[in-house]
């Protein structure tokens, strides 16, 4: 699993990136309900998790965009001109019986160009 630190406006953000279904599954099962989960919409991709204890609407848009870009760059969609990334609080993400697969409610969306 890859981890990255991101500084924005004097705040340090921690980001985790699952590189395969086992790591993705581990992220889903161990992340806090307030962490923010990112995934390429309607295709397989890495799971990106922003460690967080704030409300989603309090996170700067630049931080959300950074996580979405990491999600795109770690997916099979990395060479596409436009890529739709879904993101939501981990409280809305549930593991299924299939390793690395999830069900999601309460989506927000961002288009990465």
Segment roles from a protein language model:
Residues 1-113:
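Duplex nucleic acid-engaging cores and interfaces of nucleic-acid transaction enzymes
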């Amino acid at each position: 699993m890859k981890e990255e630190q991101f500084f924005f406006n004097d705040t340090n953000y921690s980001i985790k990136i699952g590189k395969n279904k086992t790591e993705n599954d581990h992220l889903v099962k161990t992340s806090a309900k307030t962490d923010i989960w990112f995934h390429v919409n309607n295709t397989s991709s890495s799971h990106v998790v922003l460690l967080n204890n704030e409300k989603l609407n309090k996170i700067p848009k630049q931080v959300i965009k950074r996580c979405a870009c990491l999600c795109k760059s770690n997916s099979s969609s990395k060479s596409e001109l436009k890529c739709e990334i879904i993101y939501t609080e981990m409280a809305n993400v549930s593991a299924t019986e299939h390793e690395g697969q999830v069900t999601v409610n309460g989506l927000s969306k961002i288009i990465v160009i």
